[in-house]
């Protein structure tokens, strides 16, 4: 039995899709425990590039059963568009299963998301506008719509009307928008009921029975540690807990059953949207990483902010997730750049911080303290073992490992599934 949780260790876009694609073919179930269609990822299989938004990368596995867990918020229109798009390219999404307890994104959630961001103006968080935050807000306010609700029209209508009683007051009186008609929302959900019904399961029961039978489960977290609503750079965060603890809650797999916590981390750092970013680059090297690394958001098309590797964040992510292993990605992007700065600590008002500063204000004013290592000039994209890497690349990886709080078990040297060096197999412990 193995229950492995995959967690982004930075601000997202670390390459979680690649890690899931590699491990997904070796497990029985791949579960997405949190998030929605607000965080895309790219997977390259057989030379074909797939851009996924709501579905877990495990949907491309030929053997694993992909599951959307109870912690996911699901836009049904986006779900079936993504399924249809995959099947049009020959992929088989028929094994997909969905927790009956997952919450649904309603059209009014997207409306609320957009008007709230517009109202905030310069104070806007920079959401994707897909209604994820308002859906989670309804969940914790106990007025959300769950997957199971669309199979009982009476309950569905009651819940939609209840939710809109308040939202229409806000839309009309505060934002000067038209009221949303409840019956239109009800019919929107009902139109998907027949297609959705065969996919719906008691995911917690299925997954725990699988583990009891000695099967392997992979939990594919969305977003990343620094976007966690509790542990991230609040308020510039997502609305869920994309950390290892959140994966347990969002899948229904108890924390004592998790055998490995695998952090995914880039050989440099990126971020999308607003918020503090100590190692951010505003010079030619920022543009270089953006261009060579292909740092454009899958979901939004926005260019990612780029900076050097931040070991303070890595140590923090190791701590809050209990990482047993790291999967380092995009090492190849650093080939030929001369020297590579590594952030080893922060300076905050003249005081050195080796760990995350206590307050948001301190983090916002943190200045990185760098040490520098020489880069390598050799092409590493065909390297199959750690020993195949140039010595300077080996030294860089080992230094990151020393600084980051967990062993480096996988090293990505290119975008392809086969462009990965395996030092330790997390399925073997």
Curated annotation (Swiss-Prot):
Co-factor: note: Binds 1 Mg(2+) ion per subunit.
Position of the signal peptide: none
Keywords attached to this entry: Cytoplasm, GTP-binding, Ligase, Magnesium, Metal-binding, Nucleotide-binding, Purine biosynthesis
E.C. no: 6.3.4.4
Required cofactor(s): Mg(2+)
Ligand binding (Mg(2+)): 13, 40
Main location: cytoplasm
Role noted for this protein: Plays an important role in the de novo pathway of purine nucleotide biosynthesis. Catalyzes the first committed step in the biosynthesis of AMP from IMP.
Name by which UniProt lists this protein: Adenylosuccinate synthetase
Originating species: Corynebacterium glutamicum (strain R)
Gene it is expressed from: purA
């Amino acid at each position: 039995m193995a229950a492995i949780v995959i967690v982004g260790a930075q601000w997202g876009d670390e390459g979680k899709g690649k890690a899931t694609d590699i491990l997904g073919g070796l497990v029985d179930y791949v579960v997405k425990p949190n998030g929605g269609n607000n965080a895309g990822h790219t997977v390259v299989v057989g030379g074909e590039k797939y851009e996924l938004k709501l579905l877990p990368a495990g949907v491309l596995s030929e053997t694993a059963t992909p599951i959307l867990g109870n912690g996911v918020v699901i836009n049904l229109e986006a779900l079936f568009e993504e399924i249809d798009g995959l099947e049009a390219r020959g992929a088989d999404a028929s094994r997909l299963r969905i927790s009956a307890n997952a919450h649904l994104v309603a059209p009014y959630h997207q409306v609320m998301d957009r008007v709230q961001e517009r109202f905030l103006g310069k104070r806007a968080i920079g959401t994707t506008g897909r209604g994820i935050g308002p859906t989670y807000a309804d969940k914790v306010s106990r007025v959300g719509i769950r997957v199971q609700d669309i199979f009982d029209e009476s309950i569905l209508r009651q819940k939609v009307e209840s939710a809109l009683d308040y939202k229409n007051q806000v839309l009309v009186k505060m934002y000067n928008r038209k009221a949303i008609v409840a019956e239109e929302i009800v019919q929107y959900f009902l139109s998907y009921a027949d297609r959705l019904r065969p996919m719906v399961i008691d995911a917690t029961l299925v997954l725990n029975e699988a583990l009891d039978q000695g099967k392997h489960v992979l939990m594919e977290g969305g977003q990343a540690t620094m976007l966690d609503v509790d542990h991230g750079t609040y308020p510039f965060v997502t609305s869920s807990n994309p950390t290892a603890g959140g994966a347990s809650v969002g899948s229904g797999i108890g924390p004592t059953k998790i055998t490995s916590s695998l952090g995914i981390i880039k050989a440099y750092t990126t971020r999308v949207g607003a918020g503090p970013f100590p190692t951010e680059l505003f010079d030619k090297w920022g543009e270089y990483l953006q261009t060579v690394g292909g740092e454009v958001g899958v979901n939004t098309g926005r260019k990612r902010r780029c900076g050097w590797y931040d070991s303070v964040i890595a140590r923090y992510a190791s701590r809050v997730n209990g990482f047993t292993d790291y999967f380092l990605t995009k090492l190849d992007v650093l080939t030929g750049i001369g020297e590579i700065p590594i952030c080893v600590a922060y300076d905050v008002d003249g005081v050195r911080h080796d760990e995350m500063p206590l307050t948001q204000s301190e983090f916002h004013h943190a200045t990185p303290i760098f040490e520098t290592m020489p880069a390598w000039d050799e092409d590493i994209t065909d390297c199959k073992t750690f020993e195949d890497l140039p010595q300077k690349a080996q030294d860089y990886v080992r230094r990151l490992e020393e600084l980051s709080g967990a062993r480096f078990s996988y090293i990505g040297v290119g975008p392809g599934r086969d462009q990965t060096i395996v030092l330790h197999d997390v399925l073997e412990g």
